[in-house]
């Protein structure tokens, strides 16, 4: 059932407030209107496009991390609960893929996961001690990879972090990281 313009606009605002990472395409499917209509409604509501919403959320999250600088982070940090869990997203661009196949280079997915582990741990010095990783599915040009990291254990010198990365709802990468930390810096 299609909503009247005012009700649709309010519903769009509520959807974006509850999930700032929802795409115009997903909104258009949800409200059964064209993507152009969604864009006009967002403009009327002064709601920025997805990339800008992601950047705004990421900027707030970078204030919570101490072990890595924003410009060193791979992807955009979209959620962080220090020493507990964190999420990032990474858009796969032409610089990130093999040109012949359009498949993402493995070190790009590893770098996203690794920098997420470093950012997750709120200590002055955090280094990767060891990792065990698996590439599950191919990641392609223009995919958006969402990495989720969570601390599974902590000792006097190490955090043990599990990372799972997804494209939409498909698991594409997983890894276990043993992260050394030093409180002295």
UniProtKB/Swiss-Prot annotation:
A Gene Ontology BP annotation from the UniProt entry: fatty acid biosynthetic process
Alphabetized UniProt keyword annotations: DNA-binding, Fatty acid biosynthesis, Fatty acid metabolism, Lipid biosynthesis, Lipid metabolism, Repressor, Transcription, Transcription regulation
Family annotation (SUPFAM superfamilies): Thioesterase/thiol ester dehydrase-isomerase (SSF54637)
Pfam family, one: 4HBT
CDD domains per record: hot_dog
Keyword Lipid metabolism found: yes
Cystine pairs: none
HAMAP family from the UniProt entry: Transcrip_fact_FapR
Classification via NCBIfam families: PRK04424.1 (NF003359)
Function: Transcriptional factor involved in regulation of membrane lipid biosynthesis by repressing genes involved in fatty acid and phospholipid metabolism.
The name this protein goes by in its record: Transcription factor FapR
Lineage of origin: Bacteria, Bacillati, Bacillota, Bacilli, Bacillales
